[in-house]
Amino acid sequence: MWQKLAWIALAGAGGTLSRYALSGLVQNLCGASFPWGTWVVNGLGCFLFGMIWALAEERLLITGEIRFIVLTGFMGAFTTFSTFAFEASQFLRDSEWLLAAIHLIGQNSLGLVCVFLGFTISQII
């Protein structure tokens, strides 16, 4: 158990550092007028999440344990948007249109509200 937690933590550190480096690089190249770094990180994270899932699930090229460590540790730290998109794609793949809509609209709305609340509360304190 502890060994698995250590691997997840190590993968998480790698994801965090990768996000910081890639996002910063893209922002420096594209300018700070729009969050292109976040877009690139989230897009790449979604792509990698789907690829890793398929390699483990459909082609059996990655073991379930390695997949768990990479998706939970690295991708969890690199971007949680990849998990969000994957969950939405599963609803769509299963033709659960209402659940997909609730998930997509709800998560985005909740995120915006939470960011606004955090910003507002931090100004009051």
UniProtKB/Swiss-Prot annotation:
The keyword Transferase does not apply. Keywords: Cell inner membrane, Cell membrane, Ion channel, Ion transport, Membrane, Metal-binding, Sodium, Transmembrane, Transmembrane helix, Transport. It catalyses: fluoride(in) = fluoride(out). It comes from the Bacteria. One of its GO terms (cellular component) is plasma membrane. Fluoride-specific ion channel. Important for reducing fluoride concentration in the cell, thus reducing its toxicity. This is Fluoride-specific ion channel FluC. It comes from Nitrosococcus oceani (strain ATCC 19707 / BCRC 17464 / JCM 30415 / NCIMB 11848 / C-107).
